[in-house]
Amino acid sequence: MVMTDPIADFLTRIRNANMVKHETLEVPASKIKRDIAEILKREGFIRDVEYIEDDKQGVIRVFLKYGKNEERVITNLKRISKPGLRAYVKADEVPKVLNGLGIAIISTSEGVITDKEARAKNIGGEVIAYVW
């Protein structure tokens, strides 16, 4: 079976593991998944991320984060730009997620960054996902 949207699969695996309160999950590695995982870690949505090399493409191990009373830190993840319908924004159209409570992950000419960083650098790009 050929996977048509590995980013959507990655986000769905995080969402599903988060819903059943798993501590970790593993996904096949790629550069964009690594970048997304690093953003989620930097923004405080996940506890940690590890890269495990193997003979093939490698594995990304994501350590999920929960609050004091086991409440989920990630409420939801939503894929925006899809293979069948890409979503691009100009620098002045970069979206705010829940009035700044969430983040938009954007692929730009300067790499994968958050909506706040895109606004600060005044660049647009492809909106990959919303996380809140």
Curated annotation (Swiss-Prot):
- Single GO biological process annotation from the record: translation
| Disulfide bond positions | none
Q: What keywords are annotated for this sequence in UniProt?
A: Ribonucleoprotein, Ribosomal protein, RNA-binding, rRNA-binding
Q: What is this protein called?
A: Small ribosomal subunit protein uS8
Q: GO terms for molecular function, please?
A: rRNA binding; structural constituent of ribosome
Subunit structure, as described in the record: Part of the 30S ribosomal subunit. Contacts proteins S5 and S12.
Q: Its function?
A: One of the primary rRNA binding proteins, it binds directly to 16S rRNA central domain where it helps coordinate assembly of the platform of the 30S subunit.
What is stated as this protein's family in its record? Belongs to the universal ribosomal protein uS8 family.
